Amino acid sequence: MTKWFNVGKIVNTHGVRGEIRVISRTDFPEERYKVGNTLYISNEKDTDYLPVKVTSHRQHKTFDLLTFEGYNNVDEVEKFKGSLIKVPEEQLGELAEGEYYYHEIIGCSVVTEEGEALGTIKEILSPGANDVWVIKRPKGQDLLIPYIDDVVLQVNIENKLVTIHVMEGLL
């Protein structure tokens, strides 16, 4: 059985030439949305997958704008609003050591180097120079942890466990 990964959500159309506006959920939008790549649009029930070939990709504000082969006007892509864009597991490439896919990190438990449980990673933000991991704490506000070597000491994907060093002012 094929395992599918969500790489974006189609939130609207853009213009009249069949461009769609996507909120990206992929770690590598330039690679994932490269012209010629095949993506799959899934329905709400996640039971049917429509293969589409990317014919253009550009970034606009906080969105990725895509066009697909054979879909040349707004009327043809209107039906995709609200759909998810997915890729099968075999389209995920191998990563270098110390690099992880978002889906591998989200859901990991986070502990300090002293063993204190802080919470679970619920989201990854990419505001600039480095990613920021959002940790849902059992009580209180979410905690924001920069993904830098001085803070993230160890990532154990098999055990879904991340060990961090708490720098002054982080908590």
From Swiss-Prot:
Q: Origin, by domain of life?
A: Bacteria
InterPro entries with a match to the protein in the record? PRC-brl_dom, PRC_barrel-like_sf, RimM, RimM_N, RimM_N_sf, Transl_B-barrel_sf
Spell out the subcellular localization from the entry: Cytoplasm
GO MF terms listed in the record are: ribosome binding
Instruction: Provide the GO biological process annotations.
Output: ribosomal small subunit biogenesis; rRNA processing
Q: Which family does it belong to?
A: Belongs to the RimM family.
Q: Which NCBIfam families match?
A: 16S_RimM
What name has this protein been given in UniProt? Ribosome maturation factor RimM
Q: Which organism is it from?
A: Bacillus cereus (strain G9842)
